[in-house]
Swiss-Prot record:
Top-level taxonomy: Bacteria, Pseudomonadati, Pseudomonadota, Gammaproteobacteria, Enterobacterales
Cellular component GO terms, alphabetical: cytosol
Designated name of the protein: Uncharacterized protein YdcY
Compositional bias per record (Basic and acidic residues), positions renumbered to this chain: 59-70
Pfam families cross-referenced by the UniProt entry: DUF2526
Annotated gene: ydcY
Region annotation (Disordered) ranges: 54-77
Length: 77
């Protein structure tokens, strides 16, 4: 397995796990990875950034839906 394949597997696992802290740690680790080409590093970092952004958007939508449900009738239950 090549180093790039290992990195892709790590990125896949971090995205599947969906833990922002782990994705951020991997983003930082990739920044210092001299074995990857600039293009490969950028591609994997973009995958992580996109997953982080989607996670944040989903969290916001979930919180808004929760607030809406809790405030039916005008007051928080």
């Amino acid at each position: 397995m090549s180093h790039l394949d290992e990195v892709i597997a790590r990125v896949d696992a971090a995205i599947e796990e969906s833990v922002i802290a782990h994705m951020n740690e991997l983003l930082i680790a990739l920044s210092d990875d001299a074995e990857l080409s600039r293009e490969d590093r950028y591609t994997q970092q973009q995958r992580l950034r996109t997953a982080i952004a989607h996670h944040g958007r989903k969290h916001k939508e979930d919180m808004e839906a929760r607030h809406e449900q809790l405030t039916k009738g005008g007051t928080i239950l």
